[in-house]
Amino acid sequence: MAGKKVCIVGSGNWGSAIAKIVGSNASQLAHFDPRVTMWVFEEDIGGRKLTEIINTQHENVKYLPGHKLPPNVVAVPDVVQAATGADILVFVVPHQFIGKICDQLKGHLKANTIGISLIKGIDEGPNGLKLISEVIGESLGIPMSVLMGANIASEVAEEKFCETTIGCKDPAQGQLLKELMQTPNFRITVVQEVDTVEICGALKNIVAVGAGFCDGLGFGDNTKAAVIRLGLMEMIAFAKLFCSGSVSSATFLESCGVADLITTCYGGRNRKVAEAFARTGKSIEQLEKEMLNGQKLQGPQTARELHSILQHKGLVDKFPLFTAVYKVCYEGQPVGEFICCLQNHPEHM
């Protein structure tokens, strides 16, 4: 029987780190096709195409420099061509681009394709919250799983030990995806609460912006710990309000929950840029250009989408930390007033 074909949709920092793992595993495991395609948004790097550089030097020199990709990972600049014939699609692009990509892929996938989203973010639907995996699943008519965890891309690429969580409703699919992605240093737990796993991945970026504000304002470790805890409480409260399936507190103790929250609040780009925002007074857009090579920050954008949903439901007051991050990023509230928003938190009433 032919091995299952895998396509990675996306090739940024995290997409390239995952390509390293998937490419290596696919080349060694009999039930996967060794050739892994990776859709690359074509860019010009010093007069050469990025796809050409990846396919000859086996390195994403722009988004994951210094790390060799397996030679069986093939960069393809056309997303439809990359996904043609794929049995498994791994989605790992900034969440604001997913709608357009799904529109391009519609009608071009083979029957029985499955997808897994590594995208941290949420979307607004007509009835409020829309998870990215739902957007993809409904658009393409494929079953979707998610992978979220304490996974800073550069550390995963360096093969430093970490854990992650796959949310998958179908145990057989969950096992297949685990085989494709697990390594001795990238350990995977599979749970069935897909919605909760994905909500964790999106909301922790908002909390990390708050943690970055604390660092930029020099508030110290106790304050930052309080921000992280209050953020976790808001994440759980939000999940219980908005997830259609069951929400157990145990899922928040998996890598996708508390572990991802901790690593993002101490090491991630949302924290780093938010700290610079509090220190320098420069805009988020300017700091993205200066610090992230033009890549987009997920935290502020997710805060904006969330705020719109909470407003719609009349629940803004129940989520003061999420609301404070939104107001500082988009409504010109002074960052120095961030802590005032937490002094009357519902948790303390």
UniProtKB/Swiss-Prot annotation:
Q: Where does it reside?
A: Cytoplasm
Q: What is its main location?
A: cytoplasm
Please give the start and end residues of each transmembrane region: none
Q: Tell me which SUPFAM superfamilies the record gives.
A: 6-phosphogluconate dehydrogenase C-terminal domain-like, NAD(P)-binding Rossmann-fold domains
Q: Coiled coil located at which positions?
A: none
Entry EC no(s):
1.1.1.8
KW Phosphoprotein (keyword) present: yes
What family does the database annotate?
A: Belongs to the NAD-dependent glycerol-3-phosphate dehydrogenase family.
Oligomer and partners: Homodimer.
What is the protein's given name? Glycerol-3-phosphate dehydrogenase [NAD(+)], cytoplasmic
**Source organism per UniProt:** Rattus norvegicus (Rat)
